[in-house]
């Protein structure tokens, strides 16, 4: 077997396993790199473009003279219908070598049929890894990665294969998918125009499954708003319009996404939103202006009666006391108490009956007493006349009818005579009918006149025991009371 002649062609790489002598040496040598990706000669489903950077043919329809090389099997793009003789000479002089020497894809002797010329390649070989439809060209040329038509390529026609229409990306194409046709036998939809509103669409009643059926097709929807959105596909209405570019959309969410980009591209100097339709905005402003006019007229024709000072009870009172009216017949409260007896008030300001803190003959003194400054109820002198009128109210019927109320923290114990002047008056201390509220006459006159006032709030841990001695009023800490010590010290003196 003759050895390959590497000296005749120094421009070819040594890695090629088999070379052939030139059959027609008068032709110019063309570089033929190993660019046919190792496929059999006639495989229309694979790409057959060489990797050279120049056009092989000037015209795809004219037959080409055979270009033969001294390298290994020439690519299929360099063969034509006229090179049967070259293939016969190859099969006679050089039988096929073993498979371990020659690549399995380069044994072209098993395919003696004529090979069709490939279409001329495009000048954009760098986008072979891109998917189809990634770009569109305005000159109408097909994409270089598009598979050509093998039938047209075999006939020498169709240089660019089957042409695809150029794909143009439309902003908001989600709402432009076309009008859905109606099912035969259903009612044809009535269009409202391109800018029709979606609110005047009549929603049919629910079917047996509790869903809303479409009157134009066989679809059903669980919610009425979804059916409304679907009906826009039948009518072709696009009720939502962009105020910046006057483009219309079928749904508000599509318009919102478009408006965010459109305001960046075109600018939004007025600060309008995606739902600021010009006509709707005009109607809204007119309605608001009409409402403001009606409101101003209503304020002008308002009542001439001056308003009160903000206290509703002041209009019913006999006279304002300290700026607050306390009416004899307040409208919000009834004169009859639900518990059967009169609830006592504190300092005459409770919400009982109107005159519950005063005798019937003392109602005229209400305003003058409340206008005077209050005195400490714990240091009241029983001999004075002015406070005595409010402390010793003549209520014989109430004191006889009601039992004495006992404070649980201060249990009442048997003690001295209630009428005794030197001891504590327990009935007057816890008298429920007393109008001064908490405790009346805690200290006797002898203690309150010359001694320092003792704290009225006594500790709850100590217990009161009545004394058996008749000593002076200052014995035992309080008059007539023995304070038991809570410590281990003794009697607490």
Swiss-Prot record:
<feature type="region of interest" description="Disordered">
    <location>
        <begin position="468"/>
        <end position="493"/>
    </location>
</feature>
<keyword id="KW-0862">Zinc</keyword>
<feature type="zinc finger region" description="C2H2-type 2; degenerate">
    <location>
        <begin position="240"/>
        <end position="265"/>
    </location>
</feature>
<dbReference type="InterPro" id="IPR013087">
    <property type="entry name" value="Znf_C2H2_type"/>
</dbReference>
<comment type="similarity">
    <text>Belongs to the krueppel C2H2-type zinc-finger protein family.</text>
</comment>
<dbReference type="GO" id="GO:0005634">
    <property type="term" value="C:nucleus"/>
</dbReference>
<feature type="compositionally biased region" description="Polar residues">
    <location>
        <begin position="288"/>
        <end position="307"/>
    </location>
</feature>
<dbReference type="GO" id="GO:0008270">
    <property type="term" value="F:zinc ion binding"/>
</dbReference>
<feature type="compositionally biased region" description="Polar residues">
    <location>
        <begin position="484"/>
        <end position="493"/>
    </location>
</feature>
<feature type="region of interest" description="Disordered">
    <location>
        <begin position="164"/>
        <end position="202"/>
    </location>
</feature>
<feature type="compositionally biased region" description="Polar residues">
    <location>
        <begin position="192"/>
        <end position="202"/>
    </location>
</feature>
<keyword id="KW-0863">Zinc-finger</keyword>
<feature type="region of interest" description="Disordered">
    <location>
        <begin position="68"/>
        <end position="140"/>
    </location>
</feature>
<keyword id="KW-0677">Repeat</keyword>
<dbReference type="GO" id="GO:0000978">
    <property type="term" value="F:RNA polymerase II cis-regulatory region sequence-specific DNA binding"/>
</dbReference>
<dbReference type="GO" id="GO:0000785">
    <property type="term" value="C:chromatin"/>
</dbReference>
<dbReference type="GO" id="GO:0000981">
    <property type="term" value="F:DNA-binding transcription factor activity, RNA polymerase II-specific"/>
</dbReference>
<feature type="region of interest" description="Disordered">
    <location>
        <begin position="288"/>
        <end position="316"/>
    </location>
</feature>
<keyword id="KW-0804">Transcription</keyword>
<feature type="compositionally biased region" description="Low complexity">
    <location>
        <begin position="1"/>
        <end position="18"/>
    </location>
</feature>
<feature type="zinc finger region" description="C2H2-type 1">
    <location>
        <begin position="212"/>
        <end position="234"/>
    </location>
</feature>
<dbReference type="InterPro" id="IPR051059">
    <property type="entry name" value="VerF-like"/>
</dbReference>
<keyword id="KW-0805">Transcription regulation</keyword>
<feature type="region of interest" description="Disordered">
    <location>
        <begin position="1"/>
        <end position="50"/>
    </location>
</feature>
<keyword id="KW-0479">Metal-binding</keyword>
<keyword id="KW-0539">Nucleus</keyword>
<feature type="compositionally biased region" description="Polar residues">
    <location>
        <begin position="69"/>
        <end position="79"/>
    </location>
</feature>
<dbReference type="InterPro" id="IPR036236">
    <property type="entry name" value="Znf_C2H2_sf"/>
</dbReference>
<protein>
    <recommendedName>
        <fullName>C2H2-type transcription factor ffmA</fullName>
    </recommendedName>
</protein>
<comment type="function">
    <text>Transcription factor that acts in coordination with atrR to regulate the expression of the ABC-type multidrug transporter abcG1 and thus plays a role in azole susceptibility. Regulates the expression of genes involved in fermentation. Is able to promote expression from the yeast FLO11 promoter.</text>
</comment>
């Amino acid at each position: 077997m003759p050895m390959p002649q590497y000296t005749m062609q120094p421009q070819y790489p040594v890695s090629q396993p088999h070379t052939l002598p030139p059959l027609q040496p008068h032709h110019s040598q063309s570089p033929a790199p190993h660019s046919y990706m190792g496929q059999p000669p006639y495989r229309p489903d694979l790409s057959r473009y060489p990797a050279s950077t120049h056009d092989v043919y000037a015209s795809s329809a004219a037959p080409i003279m055979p270009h033969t090389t001294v390298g290994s099997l020439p690519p299929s793009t360099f063969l034509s219908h006229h090179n049967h003789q070259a293939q016969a000479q190859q099969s006679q002089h050089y039988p096929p070598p073993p498979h371990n020497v020659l690549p399995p894809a380069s044994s072209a002797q098993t395919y003696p049929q004529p090979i069709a010329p490939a279409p001329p390649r495009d000048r954009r070989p760098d986008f072979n890894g891109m998917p189809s439809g990634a770009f569109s060209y305005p000159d109408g040329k097909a994409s270089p990665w598009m598979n050509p038509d093998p039938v047209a390529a075999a006939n020498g026609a169709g240089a660019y294969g089957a042409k695809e229409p150029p794909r143009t990306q439309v902003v908001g194409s989600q709402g432009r998918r076309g009008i859905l046709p109606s099912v035969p036998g259903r009612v044809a939809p009535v269009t409202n125009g391109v800018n029709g509103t979606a609110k005047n669409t009549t929603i049919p009643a629910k079917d047996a499954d509790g869903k809303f059926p479409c009157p134009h097709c066989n679809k059903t929807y669980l919610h009425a708003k979804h059916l409304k959105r679907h009906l826009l596909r039948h009518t072709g209405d696009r009720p939502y319009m962009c105020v910046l570019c006057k483009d219309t959309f079928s749904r508000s969410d599509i318009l919102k996404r478009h408006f965010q980009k459109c305001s960046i591209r075109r600018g939004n100097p007025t600060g309008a939103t995606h739902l600021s339709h010009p006509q709707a905005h005009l109607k809204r402003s007119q309605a608001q202006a009409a409402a403001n006019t009606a409101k101003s007229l209503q304020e002008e024709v308002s009542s001439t009666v001056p308003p009160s000072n903000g206290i509703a009870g002041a209009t019913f009172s006999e006279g304002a006391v300290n700026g607050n009216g306390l009416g004899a017949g307040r409208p919000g409260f009834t004169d009859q108490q639900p518990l059967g007896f009169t609830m006592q008030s504190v300092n005459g300001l409770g919400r009982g009956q109107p005159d519950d803190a005063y005798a019937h003959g003392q109602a005229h003194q209400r305003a003058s007493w409340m206008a005077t400054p209050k005195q400490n109820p714990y240091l009241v002198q029983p001999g004075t006349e002015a406070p005595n009128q409010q402390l010793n109210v003549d209520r014989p019927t109430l004191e006889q009818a009601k039992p004495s109320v006992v404070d649980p923290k201060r249990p009442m114990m048997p003690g001295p005579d209630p009428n005794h002047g030197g001891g504590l008056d327990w009935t007057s201390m816890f008298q429920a009918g007393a109008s001064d509220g908490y405790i009346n006459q805690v200290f006797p006159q002898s203690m309150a006149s010359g001694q320092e006032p003792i704290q009225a709030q006594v500790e709850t841990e100590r217990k009161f025991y009545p004394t058996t001695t008749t000593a002076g009023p200052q014995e035992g800490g309080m008059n007539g009371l023995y304070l038991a010590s809570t410590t281990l010290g003794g009697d607490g003196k």
